[in-house]
């Protein structure tokens, strides 16, 4: 919906780490004429995706084996999370963990003016080190971000984690820039969270609070607001995602 509001209708769409292609299945009608490209490491899941989307160009291999520079108009998906690195010669020097690597590689594969809409762990935005956010900001403009409550993926992943949807538009070339969202601020409870969400609390779709970790510490979390449907909240939030799709 957010990408449609920007003016995107059809083009080359990439879903890296696609699983069985949940995002492909949710494409709005006006985008159905797009050419779909997917990448999935797991052979069984990848074969299921090929059966579900026979017209899509699906690669059953690691994302590191693909290399379509400046090719895609739109990239969507759920970024894999982990503390390990992917062995990709072109990116090894960055030292990024897998979810950060997916952002870096996708930024190279999307064309200038193209859009990335990724679901990622809140630590992309909230981790102490600004290094990865600075890398992204130099190569793409943050059009907006939506922070989801911790139960948003309970049915899918069986875990209560806070996730973000990030909307990025690739720049024509990397520039030296350090916008506010590269850095952290503090919320009213004193937790360090991304400056974007400090400045735009309306983009947090739940109540900010804390929870006890397995180590007995208090950690930031977002709990759903009783009586509100997440689908309705998302519909309202995407209106704040500012961007114009460039053909």
Positions of PLM-derived features:
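Local beta-strand N-terminus motif with an aromatic residue
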Residues: 10, 71-72, 142, 163
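Class I S-adenosyl-L-methionine
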Residues: 1-52, 56
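Amphipathic alpha-helical repeat scaffolds
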Residues: 76-81, 119
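Conserved Class I SAM-dependent methyltransferase catalytic core
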Residues: 39-43, 95-154, 161-167
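A short acidic, Gly/Pro-enriched loop at the edge of an enzyme's catalytic core
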Residues: 66-76
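Flexible, glycine-/basic-rich loop-and-beta segments that form/coincide
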Residues: 155-246
């Amino acid at each position: 919906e957010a990408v449609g509001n920007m003016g995107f209708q059809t083009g080359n769409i990439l879903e890296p780490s696609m699983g069985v292609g949940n995002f492909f299945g949710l494409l709005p009608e006006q985008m159905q004429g797009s050419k779909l490209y997917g990448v999935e490491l797991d052979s069984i899941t990848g074969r299921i995706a090929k059966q579900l989307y026979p017209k899509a160009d699906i690669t059953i291999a690691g994302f590191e084996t693909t290399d379509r520079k400046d090719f895609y108009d739109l990239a969507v998906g759920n970024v894999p999370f982990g503390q390990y690195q992917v062995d990709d010669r072109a990116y090894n020097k960055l030292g990024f963990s897998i979810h950060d690597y997916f952002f870096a590689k996708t930024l190279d594969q999307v064309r200038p003016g193209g859009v990335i809409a990724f679901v990622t762990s809140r630590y992309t935005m909230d981790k102490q080190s600004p290094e990865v956010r600075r890398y992204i900001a130099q190569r793409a403009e943050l059009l907006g971000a939506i922070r989801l409550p911790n139960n948003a993926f309970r049915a899918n992943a069986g875990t209560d984690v806070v996730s973000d949807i990030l909307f990025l538009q690739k720049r024509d070339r990397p520039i030296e820039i350090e916008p506010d969202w590269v850095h952290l601020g503090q919320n009213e409870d004193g937790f360090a969270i991304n400056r974007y969400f400090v400045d735009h609390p309306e983009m947090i779709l739940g109540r900010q609070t804390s929870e006890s970790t397995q180590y007995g510490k208090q950690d930031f979390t977002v709990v759903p607001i009783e009586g509100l449907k997440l689908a309705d909240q998302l519909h309202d939030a995407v209106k704040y995602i500012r961007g114009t799709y460039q053909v």
